[in-house]
């Protein structure tokens, strides 16, 4: 058999058939569901008189609309409450496992699933959510789907897809001190652009990726969609297997040994052809800060806001000018002179225990700047929150002046109580800096947890490499 990429191995193992027009039917191993994109899908099943074909393969959690404080008073927004309540009733009616509000396992869907061992190597995984690529960190093929596709997977445990192309992104060399997985993926997007991965599944490789922890790899894969890609993935190694072992939904006993033997084959074969290859030097990756309204509009923290007049492409130049106007920034401004109003540490990109530890190191023994209106830390799940509290991280944050919240998607997107006011500027560890993403006329700068924490202390962005 000819050499295969990791993607091809998983795709071929799940391929049921390919039609004449090139559309393929593939089997789906795991389906993740949340409250926003699932109600219409369940209603479609009811109208058609269908059951969920494999309820044991679907797992649900409310996250987008869940408030992160004052939970005792319940969900006050009627639409949010309806969506959360509807998810619970649908899961009960169709026999689906749900980790509801009050369950320690509840939290952001893309933090919960790896934590529970639901995300496993070699699996196909889908969710009605853009950032499903997160689970590709496990050597899985994971991607977001639309609501009609959610219904299709619930009804059939299969999905119609066009086979994407493959791109290998090799990040070689040692990452400098102060730079993180978040900086790697922002740097990649800054290089290839938000359309650079369109039509591709990205495989992240090279020594810098191999050196990352599993949580770091999840951060990188999480933002593959922001490069326009269908999915992102990392080959299985000993770190992958060690992370999965012993988790609630991971295989046990003989099944574990059999699974590990198969998982160890989940890497691209020597000489396997990719449709595109990008090679980057990790030594060039400084801490990154986005300055515009797209993740590709990013600069090193020791750099300046770029000047659109230096951009030869007219379309890009126009986009840069529009972004600067929206963000209220002047070309040539040093990144370290950009002051922020609020700081958000959380989201499916950066709310795991390692993220919180990194942020805590940056704030320990210090105080949030008087100019900061709000600095909040939102753990990814109740279990992450519990572990952080056992390690005393909550006290470090609260003594510094941060708010320590309950799990949820929170300020990543304006779908709950945690929103920016018009014109407010936020240092955010989330994944999207689009216009209005964190609230009407909000201004979002994407950074790593340590960079966000340091900005809260200083009141503006700082180069964390300078101590």
Curated annotation (Swiss-Prot):
Essential cofactor(s): [4Fe-4S] cluster
Keywords: 4Fe-4S, Amino-acid biosynthesis, Branched-chain amino acid biosynthesis, Iron, Iron-sulfur, Leucine biosynthesis, Lyase, Metal-binding
Cofactor note: Binds 1 [4Fe-4S] cluster per subunit.
Single GO molecular function: metal ion binding
Keyword S-adenosyl-L-methionine on entry: no
Top enzyme class: lyase
Coiled coil: none
Residue positions binding [4Fe-4S] cluster: 348, 409, 412
Pathway(s) of this molecule: Amino-acid biosynthesis; L-leucine biosynthesis; L-leucine from 3-methyl-2-oxobutanoate: step 2/4
Similarity annotation: Belongs to the aconitase/IPM isomerase family. LeuC type 1 subfamily.
Listed name of the protein: 3-isopropylmalate dehydratase large subunit
Name of the gene this protein is made from: leuC
């Amino acid at each position: 058999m000819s050499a295969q990429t990791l993607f091809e191995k998983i795709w071929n193992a799940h391929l049921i058939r390919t039609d004449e027009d090139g559309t393929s039917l593939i089997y789906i191993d795991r389906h993740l569901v949340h409250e926003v994109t699932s109600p219409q899908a369940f209603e479609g099943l009811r109208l058609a008189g269908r059951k969920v074909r494999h309820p044991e393969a679907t797992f649900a959690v409310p996250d987008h609309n869940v408030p992160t404080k004052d939970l005792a008073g319940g969900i006050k927004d009627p639409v949010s409450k309806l969506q959360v309540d509807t998810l619970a009733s649908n899961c009960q009616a169709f026999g689906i496992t749900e980790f509801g509000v009050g369950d320690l396992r509840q939290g952001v869907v893309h933090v919960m699933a790896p934590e529970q061992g639901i995300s496993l190597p070699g699996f196909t995984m889908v969710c009605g959510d853009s950032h499903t690529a997160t689970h590709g960190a496990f050597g899985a093929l994971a991607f977001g789907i639309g609501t009609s596709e959610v219904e299709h997977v619930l009804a059939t445990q299969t999905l119609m897809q066009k086979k994407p192309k493959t791109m290998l992104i090799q990040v070689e060399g040692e990452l400098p001190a102060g730079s993180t997985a978040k900086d790697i993926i922002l740097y990649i997007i800054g290089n290839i652009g938000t359309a650079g991965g369109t039509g591709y599944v990205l495989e992240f490789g090279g020594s810098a990726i191999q050196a990352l922890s599993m949580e770091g790899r999840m951060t990188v894969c999480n933002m593959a969609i922001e490069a326009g890609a269908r999915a992102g993935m990392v080959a299985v190694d000993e770190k992958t297997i060690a992370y999965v072992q012993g988790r609630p939904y991971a295989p046990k006993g003989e099944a574990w040994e059999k699974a590990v033997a198969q998982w160890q084959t989940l890497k691209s074969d020597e000489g396997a052809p990719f449709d595109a290859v990008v090679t980057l030097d990790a030594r060039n990756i400084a801490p990154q800060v986005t300055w515009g309204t797209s993740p590709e509009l990013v600069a090193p923290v020791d750099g300046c806001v770029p000047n659109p007049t230096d951009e030869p492409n007219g379309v890009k130049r126009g986009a840069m000018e529009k972004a600067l106007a929206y963000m209220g920034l002047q070309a040539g401004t040093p990144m370290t002179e950009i002051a922020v109003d609020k700081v958000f540490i959380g989201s499916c990109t950066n709310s795991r225990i390692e993220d919180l530890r990194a942020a805590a190191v940056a704030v320990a023994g210090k105080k949030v700047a008087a100019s900061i209106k709000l600095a909040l830390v939102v753990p990814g799940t109740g279990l992450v929150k519990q572990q952080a509290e056992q390690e005393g991280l909550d006290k470090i944050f609260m003594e510094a002046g941060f708010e320590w919240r309950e799990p949820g998607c929170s300020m990543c997107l304006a779908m709950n109580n945690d929103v920016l006011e018009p014109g407010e500027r936020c240092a955010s560890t989330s994944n999207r800096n689009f216009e209005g993403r964190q609230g009407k006329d909000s201004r979002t700068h994407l950074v790593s947890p340590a960079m966000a924490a340091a900005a809260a202390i200083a009141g503006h962005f700082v180069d964390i490499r300078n101590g």
